Amino acid sequence: MSLNIFWFLPTHGDGKYLGTSEGARAVDHGYLQQIAQAADRLGFGGVLIPTGRSCEDSWLVAASLIPVTQHLKFLVALRPGIISPTVAARQAATLDRLSNGRALFNLVTGGDPDELAGDGLHLNHQERYEASVEFTRIWRKVLEGENVDYQGKHIQVKGAKLLYPPIQQPRPPLYFGGSSEAAQDLAAEQVELYLTWGEPPAAVAEKIAQVREKAAAQGREVRFGIRLHVIVRETNDEAWAAADRLISHLDDDTIARAQASLARFDSVGQQRMAALHGGNRDNLEVSPNLWAGVGLVRGGAGTALVGDGPTVAARVKEYADLGIDTFIFSGYPHLEESYRVAELLFPHLDVQRPEQPQTGGYVSPFGEMVANDILPKSVSQS
């Protein structure tokens, strides 16, 4: 099975280490453009753009990077309850047209009650999922060209319609991640691809089975994806040393404050991430080559696959064997790590790459010339 491999745009900050300004770098438009263009050239299928008050706006970032990329798809956030589903459908269709069919959408219900209240959304966990179901039903139908009247508990529209359709038909795909029962019910009814954060394979297999069963009961099939960090190096020892360096500036107080902040979240997925490490920096390898160190101070995806190319590829294939076809990766710093993943991991996987222009041989430098006169020795990439 060919795998879809996505990268990540760190619009909430980037650097060499977690939890410190040491080795940090400014994430301005020029830097985001560097990462997007690297991902585009290296053969990543798309990039996930995060959302929330700690991030730049994902829609504006995507729109700004469309003109400077050729093949890359942009996975941007839909925020039920924050915006009208009809307006969101018009925005989605516009972004899809502007990008010539390179727009993908990620339904994000939110998990931080404090942040949501600041955005004007005062619904509890169950109510947010009720509103998300209503939002998504309307959004899908409007994008598919229907005239929509809908009277829901949280959302009511009359005569909602779209005059200018998207490029992708019947509409761009919808991605979504959530671990609660309500989230799985929404996924089974509404989305094309269900995402999970990087839990151990047995836990992921259980979630996939649950969503697959719920979708089948509605006569639907759902694809599956996973969100993970990657620390890949030429040897396993080098990879584990890099993992240790990533958290080498973290002190116990920073970890405790981060975990206290994340504890207020009502996201089941966030609670499951926190349970993997318990706020303790010891015994962070929670499954073979699955390291929970990132989650000590980062909300959301908190685990990384660690190892050399063949080792990480073997773990990726374990998840693929469960039915996962889409992997959304990231690494610190994101520019350099995009190259490491492409160079050290891609050769060991069947990666579904966007079409690239064919050069017909060496028409530009590919490895530094030897003695200014001799082409570098060719090495198989398989």
Curated annotation (Swiss-Prot):
Q: Which Gene3D superfamilies match?
A: Luciferase-like domain (3.20.20.30)
Q: Where is the signal peptide?
A: none
Q: Name one GO molecular function term.
A: alkanesulfonate monooxygenase activity
Extract the SUPFAM superfamilies matched here: Bacterial luciferase-like
Q: Which InterPro entries match?
A: Alkanesulphonate_mOase_FMN-dep, Luciferase-like_dom, Luciferase-like_sf, SsuD_RutA_monooxygenase
| Catalysed reaction equations from the record | an alkanesulfonate + FMNH2 + O2 = an aldehyde + FMN + sulfite + H2O + 2 H(+)
What Enzyme Commission number(s) apply to this enzyme?
Answer: 1.14.14.5
Query: Does Protease appear among the keywords?
Result: no
Taxonomic superkingdom: Bacteria
Family under the similarity heading: Belongs to the SsuD family.
Q: Which PANTHER family match?
A: ALKANESULFONATE MONOOXYGENASE (PTHR42847), ALKANESULFONATE MONOOXYGENASE-RELATED (PTHR42847:SF4)
Report what the protein is called.
Alkanesulfonate monooxygenase
Question: What is the native source organism of this protein?
Answer: Pseudomonas putida (strain W619)
The encoding gene is ssuD
